[in-house]
Design a protein with these regions (language model features):
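Rhodanese-like catalytic fold shared by cysteine-dependent sulfurtransferases
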Residues: 1-33, 40-71, 80-123
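Short, surface-exposed ligand- or partner-binding patches at beta-edge/loop junctions that are enriched
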Residues: 75
Length: 123
């Protein structure tokens, strides 16, 4: 972990962010998946049915559930825990980004009729 931290630059940090609009575009093209790293008591309250749900503390043991050919967009309610998850995934060789503003920003982006902007059928 120390070597990873020493290798980080401001460029790395800036390229790790993705907006809710950018996420929707990439999700619709099949290039990304949403990783919801909240704990079960949080996802029971409100969830994102299209997300892969892996609590942050289980992430090291469940890496095999994540595709290596897509960008993993890490998300939590804001974007605090997702920073940790993103950096961990990058260290493990995944392509990963942080959802800017977190799930709150994504929920706001998809509010009401805008929910139709997210395409689930990519046949």
């Amino acid at each position: 972990m120390e070597d990873f931290l020493r290798s980080m630059t401001m460029k790395d940090i800036g390229t790790s962010l993705i907006s809710a609009d950018q996420f929707v575009t990439l999700f619709n093209s099949g290039e990304t998946v949403l990783l919801d790293i909240r704990y079960p008591f949080e996802t029971r309250l409100w969830g994102m049915s299209f997300a892969v749900e892996i609590p942050l503390n289980e992430l090291p043991d469940r890496l095999a559930e994540l595709p290596r050919d897509k960008t993993i967009v890490c998300a939590c309610p804001l974007d605090i825990r997702s920073n940790i998850a993103c950096q961990y995934l990058l260290q493990q060789g995944f392509k990963a980004k942080i959802l800017l503003g977190g799930l709150v920003a994504l929920a706001e982006r998809l509010r009401g009729g805008a929910a139709n902007d997210l395409k689930f059928d990519r046949a």
